[in-house]
Regions:
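Solvent-exposed, acidic/flexible segments
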Residues: 5-16, 74-75, 88, 92, ...
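Extended, small/polar residue-biased N-terminal targeting/export presequences
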Residues: 2-54, 118-137, 141-142
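PDZ/PDZ-like domain segments forming the peptide/carboxylate-binding groove
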Residues: 39-92, 166
Length: 182
């Protein structure tokens, strides 16, 4: 009945999604992603203060295990990124375009400490969007565990099941029999 009306991948993905919904099964899906010549945008592994309105981007947080999370960097919350590969970041620009196609490539970042008035440059290797998502996911899980610990006064443990698979099972099992076994 629907087949004559399906003439592109997007419509087929929609129909497949409807069928899977009728089956009421989990962990399934159909998606369509348009092909294109897009440039993947890399990440510096930083969270920014979106209330900051001056030149540059003010760092709000350095994400654990990201490009700036190392002993040799001076980047931390409050530091301003003024330039990426020599291009100044202005308040009206979309700075993300400066990171297009930069994942796994050395990138020069110019920084400024407004407290000490010091300026310096560091070379980092930005990560891909999917690598950033993994770091943010890990950050989220750790924050939930810290919340549960704080709210319960240390009486409860937080166990997160990432997926239905061996690695996730072993991680949960290790938490239950390890750090939460008292």
């Amino acid at each position: 009945k629907f087949l004559p009306h399906i003439d592109n991948n997007y419509d087929f993905a929609e129909l497949l999604s409807e069928w899977l919904g009728e089956l009421n099964v989990s962990h399934t899906g159909g998606r369509y992603y348009a092909s294109g010549q897009s440039e993947p945008t890399a990440s510096l592994g930083l969270l920014f203060d979106w209330n900051y309105r001056d030149k540059g981007m003010r760092i709000a947080e350095v994400i654990e295990k990201g490009p700036f999370d190392n002993a040799s960097t001076k980047a931390k919350a409050g530091i301003i990124i003024e330039k990426i590969d020599g291009t100044e970041i202005t308040p009206e620009m979309d700075y993300y375009t400066l990171l297009n196609d930069k994942a796994k490539k050395k990138t020069l970042v110019s920084l400024y400490n407004p407290q000490t008035k010091e300026r310096w440059e560091e070379v980092v290797i930005p990560i891909s969007g999917s690598a950033l998502n993994t770091l943010l996911y890990t950050r989220w899980v750790k924050q939930r565990a810290a919340d549960v610990d704080r709210w319960s006064g240390g009486r409860l443990g937080y166990v997160h099941i990432e997926s239905i698979g061996d690695d996730s099972f072993r991680s949960v099992y290790s938490d239950i029999l390890g750090k939460y076994n008292n």
